Swiss-Prot record:
Family named by the database record: Belongs to the MscL family.
The encoding gene: mscL
Record localization: Cell inner membrane
PANTHER family: LARGE-CONDUCTANCE MECHANOSENSITIVE CHANNEL, MECHANOSENSITIVE CHANNEL MSCL
Free-text function comment from the UniProt entry: Channel that opens in response to stretch forces in the membrane lipid bilayer. May participate in the regulation of osmotic pressure changes within the cell.
Protein name listed in UniProt: Large-conductance mechanosensitive channel
Length: 139
């Protein structure tokens, strides 16, 4: 029973749950970015370059023979994947930058010093008076 309780305590910890939510949202975000790149960015880019469909760009190293498929370098798909990565990396960078900015603002937020009590004010005045009297007595 001890191992089951340990696992339950581990799985319910906030960090594990937060990580799981982050992974799920990250996977969904990755699909959105892939669709954005493949369906929105690449078609106009291909049109500008001369009607090229990037996903079809490839170099055939060996032609297909019978049941053996062709050996190709699909560099068009690689270009799409690189663009996917750049967009995801930029989005993560912007998110981290925003979080860091919020953390800095929290840390920099000045705290107002507490108002001294009447007793502290009186003691400060007495100290200042004693300093003044001692300075006047010195030759």
């Amino acid at each position: 029973m001890g191992m089951l309780n340990e696992f339950k305590a581990f799985a319910v910890k906030g960090n594990v749950v937060d990580m799981a939510v982050g992974i799920i949202i990250g996977a969904a975000f990755g699909k959105i970015v892939s669709s954005f790149v493949g369906d929105v960015i690449m078609p106009p880019l291909g049109l500008l370059i001369g009607g090229v469909d990037f996903s079809d760009l490839a170099i055939t190293l060996k032609a297909a023979e019978g049941d053996v498929p062709a050996v190709v370098l699909a560099y068009g798909k690689f270009i799409q994947t690189v663009i996917d990565f750049v967009i995801v990396a930029f989005a993560i960078f912007m998110g981290v930058k925003a979080i860091n900015k919020l953390k800095r603002e929290e840390a920099v937020a000045p705290t107002t010093p507490p108002v001294p009590s009447a007793e502290e004010t009186l003691l400060t005045e007495i100290r200042d008076l004693l300093k003044t009297q001692n300075q006047n007595r010195l030759p």
